[in-house]
């Protein structure tokens, strides 16, 4: 009885314990929710995107109020989604939050609860957004310092390490790079030595001043935030003393704004957090003060000699009415000024006396004059000047004849073929002068053939250069070519040549020569009749003794000309080469021009047929490869199928296969029975 009575008395207390346990569980779920990414990511994205317009120098209250309304709607939406997921009402959530003990709040929950308090209190929202704006400016400044080279030398790559990554350059490119680098170095060496250290010191000083100013602004915003929280806590205490309650009893229909108000009143705690591990020291009030909009006096920097736009980050410093330096302007202008740097040329002591927004035009002009220019154009101008001088030098070296016309200087490579390719005018002049000399009985002038050209027949040279169409050329070629062993000085010199083999044999008299053919060297017919042994020989390079030693036996018929077995000559026409087309070969005095005439044969392969055949072979090869791949794939599939049909090696495997088959059979039977049942039912109905 006593036990029952005690249990009956403890039932109301047990019900209260269950309610408190449920509220604690709901509170723990809410704390987990505000530390999760579902809560933090939307809020962080909203703050980073909207914090750009929050600036102490340009207080736009209307814009701030509109952004605060959007932020409050975002917080209300997130809380509503949490209540729907958990299956509770906003009133129950507020009741659970009232049991929250502020002393048990960790630093992580303090940081997570700050956005919730900012949604209810406008004075907390504005400093939070301004602090985020300054943090973004600090991140941009740090990134720009890293890009500009203001980092320790340990983190930088040396010149030797960067050269290892360069690709191999050709000698011409290497010489060009060396020339450009020498020209630049000779021009910029003195300027870089004088200004390098000063620029680095000035950049480091400007960066330090900007960082200190931004850190000071962060401290100021934290003070304002703490003050707003204190005021909210005092107002809440006064409302509690008067017996007023901000909660509503009708839990389901309670507005979400009242929930946020209750949470803000419950979590009226110190949410000021430091973003860096650096210890800050407040400046003395004697260095200069600036009163903010909320009435808090904060120490600011006064001894800054940085003009607007000196840093590469583009963060400008504004000034107040007293001339003291204020906080940097908003980050909207950070991206537009990146890359623009105009370092002040004065000393730090002189810059301290100047206002932060003013700059002297004389100093700007001086800096513009002292700015080193690039030397690429100079190098290009030097190269162009050298090219002009070289072109002028080549024009002055051109010789001038008696008539005043310029002559092109001759080259040694074209001297050997000069007489063959001479113009008709020059050849006509030569032919006009030669008859007069012959008539006077003087020595005939030597021909202008080169040393190498003298050894070749006219047949080969005509195939190289082309047929002579000018009558003057024919007139000029009527004179026999000069030889090394010939010393004839009159016109009867060609008559002293030994007779041909037929004339020596006495079979018939030599053909009578007309006066026009007396001194004319006829080109032998070298197509089919060149095999005739009775044809006169035109190779002047063979000695006369060798010509006379040729057999005079005519009973042996000439050998027929068969197909060409091989052609030793496989290159271009080069005078002086041992296998050049102009040289006669063999005892029959055949040259390669005669041999090449027989290449037009029915058995010769056509290039188009060769290409068609090659294409056909490629297609056949591709088809064979495709068939081979298909056969290989087929073999692999057969192997896999055979592996599945192999006899199981263990009893467990065999049982597994049998069970699988049984299950499939049962499923099929069940499906058939279901179909039959449906058909029977439809027939009965």
Curated annotation (Swiss-Prot):
Coiled coil: 197-242
Polar residues compositional bias, start-end: 410-434
Phosphoprotein is among the record's keywords: no
Tissues expressed in: Expressed in amphid and phasmid ciliated neurons.
Keywords: Cell projection, Cilium, Coiled coil, Cytoplasm, Cytoskeleton
One GO cellular component, as annotated: axoneme
Residue segments, region Disordered: 1-20, 287-573
Predominant cellular place of this UniProt entry's protein: other
Residue stretches of biased makeup (Basic and acidic residues): 363-372, 439-456, 508-557
Matching InterPro entries: BART_dom, BART_sf, CFAP36
Subcellular location: Cell projection, Cilium; Cytoplasm, Cytoskeleton, Cilium axoneme
Extent of Low complexity compositional bias: 287-310
PANTHER family: CILIA- AND FLAGELLA-ASSOCIATED PROTEIN 36 (PTHR21532:SF0), PHOSPHODIESTERASE HL (PTHR21532)
Family (UniProt): Belongs to the CFAP36 family.
This protein's name: Cilia- and flagella-associated protein 36
Organism expressing this protein natively: Caenorhabditis elegans
Record lineage: Eukaryota, Metazoa, Ecdysozoa, Nematoda, Chromadorea
